[in-house]
Amino acid sequence: MPLFAICRGLQEVNVALGGTLHQLVHEVDGRRDHRSPKSPDNDVNYGPAHDIDLVEGGVLHRLLGARRVRVNSLHAPRARLEAVADDGQVEAFSVPDAPGFALALQWHPEYKALENPVSMKLFDAFAAACRARADARLAAPLRAAAE
C-alpha cells in the first residue's frame, strides 16, 4: 500500500522503524527552530522557511529532478535518508524495503500544493502509486478467475 507520511507521519514511521525522536530539537546547539512561526497569517506559518538538500539518486531527487529545494518548516536504519536541512535536521526519508511507494516528509507539501511545483510532483507520484496499487488489486481476482 502506498505511504506518503507528512510531518508527524514522518515521526510515526521513524518510530515504527525503530528510530528515536528528540522532542526539543530547537534546543540542540547548531539547530534551527523548525517550529511554526506564531502568526495569524497561514501564508507566514506555512511559507517557505529554508532549503533542503536532496540525497543524490534518492526518491526525492528522482521525483523532483533537483538537488536542493525550498520548503516550509513546522514541526531513521531501515529508512533511507532523502533530504536534510542545512542545519542537519532530517527532512525526508523513504523506506527502501517497502513493496511500493513509501516516502515520509517533515514539511507540509499539502499547503498550497497546486501553486508549488515540488508539491505537485510529490502528490502526482503518490497518486500514481495509489492508482497502480488499486489496478493491481482489481486485476488479481480477474487473473484468479481466468485460471
Report residues per predicted region.
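Catalytic nucleophile loop
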Residues: 1-20
